[in-house]
């Protein structure tokens, strides 16, 4: 749901809808969350901060497939095979800034790159979850990749992105 200029009226949403077709300042006419069924899925939380040896990743850090593989191994899930509909959650530690330091939280964030996005889409995951606000690394080190993860997962593949999750509660459990 992101266009070339960010979240503006010229953007294209899933199935090619534009903002005029989607809704107005008063809400959505199409593709609103009220149309989603409850999500019941097998899920896996990938603690990327832990495999990087940090409490919190840095602004612009890109999560790679090497990170995913290392997290699966560290969590005793080396044999993990994604099944259609799986929920793939990422912990970067960024959620520690939510409400406590909104300027820092919104200044950018770590996130997945296109390599991981292709893995998610190729495995037909149904949902992704992030402790960041976009899921993408911001700023992205690739100048041609402004919210390209959003565009790829949501617009092209219809994968639901859950953002601003408190994944710290899960890794601490």
Language model features: what each stretch is:
Residues 1-173:
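Active-/binding-site microenvironments in catalytic and ligand-binding cores
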């Amino acid at each position: 749901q992101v266009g070339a200029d960010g979240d503006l009226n010229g953007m294209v949403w899933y199935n090619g809808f534009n903002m005029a077709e989607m809704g107005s300042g008063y809400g959505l006419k199409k593709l609103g969350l009220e149309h989603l069924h409850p999500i019941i899925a097998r899920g896996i939380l990938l603690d990327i901060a832990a495999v990087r040896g940090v409490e919190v990743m840095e602004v612009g850090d890109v999560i790679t497939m090497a990170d995913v593989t290392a997290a699966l191994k560290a969590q005793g899930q080396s044999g993990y095979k994604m099944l259609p509909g799986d929920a793939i959650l990422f912990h970067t530690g960024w959620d520690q800034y939510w409400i406590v330091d909104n300027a820092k939280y919104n200044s950018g964030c770590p996130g997945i790159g296109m390599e991981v996005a292709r893995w998610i889409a190729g495995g037909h995951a149904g949902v992704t979850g992030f402790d960041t606000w976009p899921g993408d690394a911001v700023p992205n080190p690739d100048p041609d990749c402004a919210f390209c993860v959003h565009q790829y997962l949501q617009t092209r593949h219809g994968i639901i992105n859950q953002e601003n999750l408190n994944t710290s509660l899960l890794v601490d459990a």
